[in-house]
Amino acid sequence: MSIISMKQLLEAGVHFGHQTRRWNPKMAPYIFTERNGIYIIDLQKTVKKVEEAYEFVKSVVADGKEVLFVGTKKQAQEAIEEESLRSGMHFVNNRWLGGMLTNFKTIKTRINKLEQLEKMEEDGTFEVLPKKEVIKLRNEKEKLEKNLGGIKNLDASNLGAIFIVDPRKEKNAIDEAKNLGIPVVAIVDTNCDPDEIDYVIPGNDDAIRAVRLITSKIADAIIEGNQGEQLAE
């Protein structure tokens, strides 16, 4: 039973690459043909690469490690959040803050601040503070929630993999992961550099359906890996 079918990939438009003038020659092995000025991705390779990434992510989670989903472009934000939550993992879908991995200690102080503000809202502290101050604190909480809400429970030292939508956009995240020796799994379009990625999934990173389909398979791998870990206990 294959992880993903050609039919699913076709229906989601995973095969549509970028315009031929906006390409990275290193992606040539993953290109099937060119049609109307657009590169068409070889979906047989995508099927194989999804399977490789799936097995890798599954083994990472079965070893008790965590996975971070990263996709801050509009087309990816919703799928990144929903699929990471469905699989009980972590996500960044608004903005990658410098040092999110390499300087997690500093980021952790911001997370603590967010948790403190949440507690203040819950225990009624906001109700007894001056209105002006509450507005200021609520705005701060909202901003922190947007940027850090998805990594509140992340243990950066236990990160086994990072999943990326659009390596060009998420270059800072990739650099930090590389710096720490964390393997990178990514949806790589025809305009990206595959050399930076440990597990390349050639595919359209601009269509919401394409992004959701592949992201959901990564989440499935996590869920299956977790079941394996539970069985081993």
Curated annotation (Swiss-Prot):
| InterPro entries assigned to the protein according to its UniProt record, in alphabetical order | Ribosomal_uS2, Ribosomal_uS2_bac/mit/plastid, Ribosomal_uS2_CS, Ribosomal_uS2_flav_dom_sf
**What's in the keyword line of the UniProt record?**
Ribonucleoprotein, Ribosomal protein
At the top level, the lineage of the source is: Bacteria
> One GO MF term, please?
structural constituent of ribosome
Please provide the Gene Ontology terms (biological process) for this protein.
translation
Q: Does the keyword Cell inner membrane apply?
A: no
A GO cellular component term found in this entry reads: cytosolic small ribosomal subunit
Record family assignment:
Belongs to the universal ribosomal protein uS2 family.
What name appears for this protein in its UniProt entry? Small ribosomal subunit protein uS2
* Lineage of origin: Bacteria, Bacillati, Bacillota, Clostridia, Eubacteriales
